[in-house]
Structure formats: structure tokens, C-alpha cells
């Protein structure tokens, strides 16, 4: 059964105290993020391809579901990606847009979030190569670059980002492989993180078992 999202308060000793729990009207969310103001929680659903917006209170508790959108479409790999699989939900650094990474249909859908109602409106789609399976997106510390790790193509896509206009502008400028060699063993790029200094980008690759 779907148990939604639970909130825990972190104590001074590191202990966790439950605050509350809310359902998301979807199947087992796999990724969480918040907007810069801490007003909304975004939930990505891998199994049902749903992005959910939940209101958050100032004390950390969760409120009601404000909006939810199911992605639609057929993926490029029928054996696995025959339907949408949302694997990451991440606001842009300027808090103007929400990037929803869908590894099932090789898309990154870009939404605006109404600051009052929490309603989502899709304004753009970044279309990645078929069978690449984009998994996570991260932004540079200065907010000028976006990095997307692709699970199937085992590469990191580098985009410039400009959110100064009414619509977001992403331009692909580089592709960097995540593997050490070109052997035929099964491998899948998985996670992506930027170092605190912003000087390094870390990624992990399953199968090859490397960082």
C-alpha cells in the first residue's frame, strides 16, 4: 500500500521524531525536493509517472496535496521503459521552474508552479536521445549549468541554463561518458552529486561499481 510521505523532526542527538504523514494519491514516490521558499514539497513517482505537489507548513509538517500530474507516452525500450517513470523532481536555482526527469520516455518536462495554488503548468520539454534514460538533474552553484545523468547511455549531459526570460532556455553543450572503459559488461549510471566547493561532479555507475 502507498503510505505517502512521512515527516521526521531531527533532534539535537540525531534522533528522529515523527511529525505527520500524508498520502500523495499515487504509487510509492521515489524522489523528494522542496522549492527554495520551503512552501511546497515535490514528489516524483517512478511506478506511475506522477509528479505531486504538497503544501508544507512553517513547522515542517505537510499539508494537503495541491496538484498532481501523470506523465503520458510510450518509452523507447518496450521491455522496461514502456511507460513514464519519473526519477527526479528538481527546482531550478532561481526557483522559477520545476524540472521533472522522466527516464521512461527520455524527457525532462519543465513546469511552472503557481506560488499561491501550487498548480503545475508545463512550459517546455527537454527531449533526450532515445534509450538514454535520463535519471537525475543537478545545477551548478552559480546556476548557469545543468547536469543530467543518463542511466542507459551512461553519460552526463551538460546544458547551459538561462531562466531570465518567460520561458527557460537550456542548450546542450557537452556529453561526457561515465564509464572507465568500453567493455561490453552491463552498466548503468545512477546517481549524481556536486561537491560543496562546486569544483567536482561525482557520479556512480552500477555494474561497473565505480564512483
Enumerate the language-model features and the residues they cover:
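Asp-box/WD-like beta-propeller blade repeats and closely related beta-sheet repeat scaffolds
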Residues: 17-88
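Blade-edge beta-strand/turn elements of extracellular beta-propeller
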Residues: 15-21, 62-65, 71-75, 116-129, ...
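Short loop/turn segments immediately following beta-strands, especially the blade-tip
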Residues: 7-14, 53-63, 111-119, 159-169
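Short coil/turn segments that connect the beta-strands within blades of beta-propeller domains
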Residues: 37-39, 94-96, 142-144, 197-199
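Structural signal for beta-propeller blades
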Residues: 3-5, 49-52, 106-108, 154-156, ...
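Loop/turn-rich, solvent-exposed surfaces of beta-rich toroidal or solenoidal domains
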Residues: 187-211
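Conserved beta-strand positions in repeat-built beta-propeller and related beta-rich domains
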Residues: 1, 43-46, 92, 100-103, ...
Amino acid at each position: 500500500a502507498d503510505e505517502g510521505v512521512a515527516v521526521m523532526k531531527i533532534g539535537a542527538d540525531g534522533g528522529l521524531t515523527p511529525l505527520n504523514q500524508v498520502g500523495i494519491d499515487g504509487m510509492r514516490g521515489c524522489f523528494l525536493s522542496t522549492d527554495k521558499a520551503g512552501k511546497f514539497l515535490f514528489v516524483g513517482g517512478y511506478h506511475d509517472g506522477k509528479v505531486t505537489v504538497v503544501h508544507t507548513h512553517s513547522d515542517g509538517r505537510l499539508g494537503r496535496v495541491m496538484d498532481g500530474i501523470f506523465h503520458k507516452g510510450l518509452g523507447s525500450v518496450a521491455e522496461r521503459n514502456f511507460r513514464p517513470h519519473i526519477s527526479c523532481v528538481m527546482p531550478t536555482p532561481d526557483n522559477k521552474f520545476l524540472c521533472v526527469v522522466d527516464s521512461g520516455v527520455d524527457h525532462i518536462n519543465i513546469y511552472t508552479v503557481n506560488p499561491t495554488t501550487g498548480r503545475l503548468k508545463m512550459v517546455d520539454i527537454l527531449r533526450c536521445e532515445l534509450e538514454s534514460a535520463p535519471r537525475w538533474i543537478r545545477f551548478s552553484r552559480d546556476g548557469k549549468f545543468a547536469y543530467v545523468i543518463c542511466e542507459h547511455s551512461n553519460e552526463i549531459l551538460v546544458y547551459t541554463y538561462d531562466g531570465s526570460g518567460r520561458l527557460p532556455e537550456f542548450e546542450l553543450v557537452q556529453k561526457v561518458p561515465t564509464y572507465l572503459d568500453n567493455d561490453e559488461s552491463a552498466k548503468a549510471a545512477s546517481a549524481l552529486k556536486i561537491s560543496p566547493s562546486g569544483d567536482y561532479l561525482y557520479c556512480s555507475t552500477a555494474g561497473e561499481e565505480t564512483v
